């Protein structure tokens, strides 16, 4: 993911599952 936030990247990139995993 472009924005890797340790808090909750899923919220910023909910359409990109790769950001979470």
Swiss-Prot record:
Function: Component of the cytoplasmic filaments that run the length of the organism just underneath the cytoplasmic membrane.
Domain of life: Bacteria
Subcellular location field: Cytoplasm
UniProt-recorded name of the protein: Cytoplasmic filament protein A
Keywords linked to the UniProt accession: Cytoplasm
Region (Disordered): 1-21
Gene Ontology CC annotation, any one: cytoplasm
Gene: cfpA
């Amino acid at each position: 993911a472009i924005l890797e936030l340790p808090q909750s990247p899923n919220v910023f990139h909910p359409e990109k599952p790769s950001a979470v995993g």
